[in-house]
């Protein structure tokens, strides 16, 4: 559970090809990083003698639910406090990264950056 933050995107290592291509692999296209990561963690857990089944299920649930909503690609909605916290953190990270990229691309004299679908807002630079 506490390690879910470390492993929630591990499937991206097999979802995407190496740089410089960094393109989707066949499994990336067909399964996606959430399913791939859940399988990778499950395979590793099976090699650890005595690993608690309940902990394994909770860790895999956190990975499966880390996008938070079905419409965002999560096969499961968060059912554990840790899964909900991870989903909030992952969503916040994605939105802050989007905002950072928008600000980097904006000209010095640009105030309004336009509507962003992920942020669901017309974005403006702050003066604070």
Regions found by a protein language model. Give the residues of each.
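N-terminal intrinsically disordered, cationic/polar leader segments
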Residues: 87, 105, 109-117, 122, ...
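Flexible, active-site-adjacent loop/turn segments at secondary-structure boundaries
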Residues: 22, 28-29, 113-117
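Short, small-residue-biased leader/transition segments that mark boundaries at the very start
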Residues: 2-3
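Histidine- and acidic-residue-rich, metal-dependent catalytic cores
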Residues: 6-9, 31-70, 118-127
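Short active-site segment of divalent metal-dependent hydrolases/proteases
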Residues: 7, 11-12, 93
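Histidine/acidic-rich helix-loop-helix segments that form or flank divalent-metal centers
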Residues: 15-26, 46-107
């Amino acid at each position: 559970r506490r390690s879910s933050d470390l492993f929630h995107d591990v499937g991206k290592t097999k979802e995407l090809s190496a740089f410089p291509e960094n393109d989707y692999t066949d499994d990336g296209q067909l399964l996606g990083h959430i399913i791939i990561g859940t399988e990778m963690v499950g395979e590793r857990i099976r090699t650890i003698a005595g690993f608690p089944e309940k902990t394994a299920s909770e860790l895999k649930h956190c990975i499966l639910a880390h996008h938070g909503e079905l419409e965002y690609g999560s096969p499961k909605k968060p059912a554990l406090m840790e899964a909900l916290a991870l989903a909030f953190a992952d969503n916040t990270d994605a939105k802050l990264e989007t905002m950072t990229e928008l600000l980097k691309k904006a000209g010095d004299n640009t105030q309004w950056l336009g509507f962003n679908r992920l942020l669901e807002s017309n974005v403006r630079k702050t003066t604070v």
